[in-house]
A protein has these predicted regions:
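Bacterial N-terminal signal peptides that target proteins for export
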Residues: 2-11
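Bacterial N-terminal signal peptides
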Residues: 11-21
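Electrostatic cytochrome c docking/interface patches
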Residues: 23-46, 137-146
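Short glycine/proline- and charge-enriched loop/turn segments
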Residues: 27-30, 70-78
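Periplasmic/extracellular electron-transfer cofactor-ligation site
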Residues: 37-39, 44-74, 99-107, 130-137
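Sequence context surrounding c-type heme c attachment/ligation sites in exported
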Residues: 41-52, 88-94, 117, 140
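Axial heme c-ligation environment in periplasmic c-type cytochrome domains
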Residues: 68, 77-78, 96-130, 139-143
Length: 146
């Protein structure tokens, strides 16, 4: 049985397509940054479980983080925008979390076998959400999204 295509049928199809188009949109970003609110929420939980013991609950780092310790390593730096994390592009931040800080003179273990790429991006989104707008913009200006 063939149904005639009427203006009403076409209108219903177009309306259905328009409504479905909105279903595939991605989540909004946080203040125009590269990450979403859900990434920050996931990252906050992951940070608490994997990073806060050394870097502090608010990613504030340790005192004298720029001074070489007696063991020959640097203490955990702040990741909240007050340290040097913003000097590194996203790829470099991911690599540091995957490989750890030992190659750079620190003692942080690598998390490549424990955290997925999505987990690592969520961690970064959490501590970057602590960065003031001026710090985030300076990071972008340095090519942070490379």
């Amino acid at each position: 049985m063939n149904m005639p295509i009427t203006n009403r049928t076409v209108a219903a199809l177009l309306l259905s397509m328009a409504l479905l188009t909105g279903c595939g949109e991605t989540e909004a970003t946080v203040d125009g940054r590269w990450y979403s609110p859900s990434q920050v929420a996931t990252g906050k939980a992951l940070f608490a479980d994997n990073c806060a013991e050394c870097h502090g609950a608010s990613a504030q780092g340790t005192q004298n983080w720029q001074t070489l310790g007696a063991d020959g390593t640097y203490p955990p730096p702040p990741l909240n925008g007050l340290g040097h994390a913003w000097h590194h592009p996203l790829k470099g931040l991911k690599r540091s979390i995957q490989q750890g800080g030992v190659p750079l003179g620190g003692s942080m273990p690598g998390f490549a076998g424990q955290l997925s790429d999505a987990d690592i991006e969520a961690l970064i989104s959490f501590f970057q959400s602590q960065w003031p707008t001026t710090t985030y913009q300076a990071w972008l200006d340095r090519g942070g999204l490379r």
